[in-house]
Design a protein with these regions (language model features):
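Bacterial Sec-dependent N-terminal signal peptides
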Residues: 1-27
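Interaction/scaffold regions that mediate signaling and macromolecular assembly across diverse proteins
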Residues: 20-97, 101-251
Length: 251
């Protein structure tokens, strides 16, 4: 009888635990591995970024192409060290952001010279690379993995090799520095006058805030989100327009 009473008393707590567990997205972006490996440090990618990407995000694809073997070494490292469920959230985010950016660069190099990533047939939809045992497309990494991790600042970290995209950082994202890197990226993008024109009563902003508006409205409006980073305080009733997106190559 005491055992039954004890179990009944536990039911609310068990129900709550199950509810919390169900509210957490399944880690489709990480695997279970009995021989769990440590998160990689992305140093190989960092060295290449320092060499071929300026502080303003311009990419020397011509020079990068001469170092494609070094890039492939890093891509092989990514393929052999997919995220583990034992990794921290920041380590997993850093992995997928770097993977997206590195494979975007590889895609451009494979088709270089060109004027725009849109000159490539279905650049985001085709499954062009393998990580672990699974084939991925850039689209899948962005929409099925990164966006599902409920971190809107990823939109300022992943780069689509185009002028209107957030600048490609010349630093690799890392587990230890991720928070400060994402904050710096968000602030830089919002206040970049080539991406957004902001005044108190009127804003002309990147189409990113239109395409992914839901990602930025989880705790308020898009204007509320912008005001977290904007150097100019935007009035809540400000007129909103969106800039034409420039898909020219970011070289």
């Amino acid at each position: 009888m005491r055992k039954i009473i004890f179990i009944i008393a536990l039911l609310p707590f068990l129900s709550c635990a199950n509810s919390n567990e169900n509210s957490i997205p399944k880690l489709a972006y990480a695997v279970e591995n009995q021989n769990s490996i440590k998160a990689i440090d992305h140093q190989k990618w960092h060295v290449l970024l320092q060499k071929y990407v300026t502080d303003k995000g311009n990419v020397d694809y011509k020079g990068f192409k001469k170092d494609v073997k070094a890039l492939q070494v890093y891509l092989d490292e990514l393929a052999a060290n997919v995220p583990q469920k034992s990794w921290s959230r920041n380590a997993i985010l850093a992995y997928w952001i770097n993977a997206y950016n590195a494979y975007t660069v590889k895609l451009i190099l494979d088709n270089y010279p060109l004027k725009s990533i849109k000159d490539i047939k279905d650049p985001w939809g085709r499954k062009l690379f393998t990580l672990g045992t699974k084939k991925y497309s850039l689209e899948e990494i962005e929409h099925e993995i990164l966006r599902k991790m409920n971190e809107p600042r990823i939109h300022f970290a992943i780069n689509c090799a185009s002028f209107s995209c957030p600048n490609l950082s010349n630093q690799a994202y890392t587990e230890a520095k991720l928070e400060s890197q994402l904050e710096a990226g968000a602030k830089a993008f919002v206040n970049d006058k080539t991406k957004n024109t902001i005044t108190a009563n009127s804003i002309e902003i990147s189409k990113i805030f239109d395409w992914f508006s839901g990602d930025f409205k989880t705790k308020g409006t898009v204007i509320d989100y912008l005001n977290q980073y904007s150097a100019v305080k935007i009035n809540k009733n400000a007129k909103v327009k969106y800039k034409e997106y420039n898909w020219s190559l970011n070289d």
